[in-house]
Regions:
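Gly/Ser/Thr-rich helix-start
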Residues: 6, 11, 70, 124, ...
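Residue-level marker of structural boundaries
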Residues: 17, 127, 184, 225-226
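Substrate-binding/access-modulating region of protease and related hydrolase catalytic domains
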Residues: 27-137, 153, 182-188, 192-194
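Extracellular S/T/G-rich loop segment that most often corresponds to the catalytic His/Ser-adjacent loop
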Residues: 115, 121, 129-206, 210, ...
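Short, small-residue-rich loop/turn micro-motifs
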Residues: 15-16, 25-28, 68-70, 170-172, ...
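Subtilisin-like serine protease catalytic core
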Residues: 1-44, 141-143, 154-155, 161-165, ...
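C-terminal subdomain of the subtilisin-like protease fold in secreted/lumenal serine endopeptidases
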Residues: 63-67, 208-251
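Solvent-exposed, polar/charged alpha-helical surfaces in well-ordered, non-transmembrane soluble domains
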Residues: 6-10, 47-54, 58, 104-111, ...
Length: 251
């Protein structure tokens, strides 16, 4: 159960002795037939999103990794698996009602903390995040970066989601990191790409703790290298650090 979170955290703090980690635990239902989503459950989740972000603010968190997400299809699939809805039309309406509560709750929670940089995985559907309605990766917020995955050669992986809301890319293929207990394993997914960007943001903050959220985004996206076809915007930590040095000299 804890493999994913441990692996992601290991990537986020790799080779950064100055990084401090705060955990906000999210668990998902892994039963063959998951518990049915309801409006009440969605409202509780929305409240929890806001409370969690407040917890981050109270503890001066600067960067948050989100290697997870929800889609409209997932909600509908859970309703269908539980036989909820007398027909497809009724189930579709209930799906939308529930999903929008999650969506608006998460959007408002992230928006409420402009001083925190949120970095999220684009998703692994090999589809457009807007078409799939993936949250939070479809959000357009000034304190959010959405990350797609490339392989070690810098090419898009076969699974990465894409679209206009995907800001940068990072390695998400066979990334080595820790398991609970200290052993290591290679795992793939945009879940592994996102903490690579968190790792860069944390190292930039280690170099200059006064950087704002907008400064971090400028340095990360400004140092990234866009592919010839425009689909990939691959982070380049060395370039981002050079940009930081240039900014410091000017100031």
């Amino acid at each position: 159960m804890y493999v994913h979170g441990t692996h992601v955290a290991g990537i986020a703090i790799n080779n950064n002795p100055y990084a401090e980690v705060m955990v906000a635990r999210i668990t998902f239902d892994h039963h063959a037939i998951p518990a049915p989503p309801t409006v009440e459950v969605a409202k509780k989740a929305a409240d929890n999103y806001m409370a969690t972000v407040k917890y981050f603010q109270d503890n001066n968190v600067r960067v948050v990794n989100m290697s997870w997400g929800w889609t409209l299809k997932e909600i509908e699939g859970m309703l269908e698996a539980n036989g909820i809805g007398k027909d497809a039309e009724e189930r579709s309406k209930l799906t939308r009602d529930i999903f929008d509560i999650y969506k608006n709750g998460l959007f408002n929670a992230i928006k409420s903390a402009p001083e925190i940089l949120f970095i999220t995985a684009a998703g692994n559907s090999d589809n457009d995040v807007t078409f799939d309605e993936v949250i939070p990766s479809l959000f357009d917020l000034p304190n959010l970066i959405t990350v797609g995955a490339v392989d070690q050669a810098g090419e898009e992986t076969g699974f990465t989601s894409f679209g206009e809301s995907v800001d940068v890319h990072a390695n998400g293929f066979e990334v080595n990191s820790y398991l609970p207990g200290g052993n290591t394993i290679e795992m793939s997914g945009t879940s592994m790409a996102s903490p690579n960007v968190v790792n860069l943001a944390a190292k930039l903050l280690a170099l200059d703790g006064s950087l704002t959220t907008s400064d971090l985004i400028e340095l990360i996206t400004g140092g990234a290298e866009k592919s010839d076809n425009g689909r990939i915007n691959l982070i380049n930590p060395m370039k981002s650090v050079e940009l930081l040095k240039t900014v410091k000299k000017k100031s």
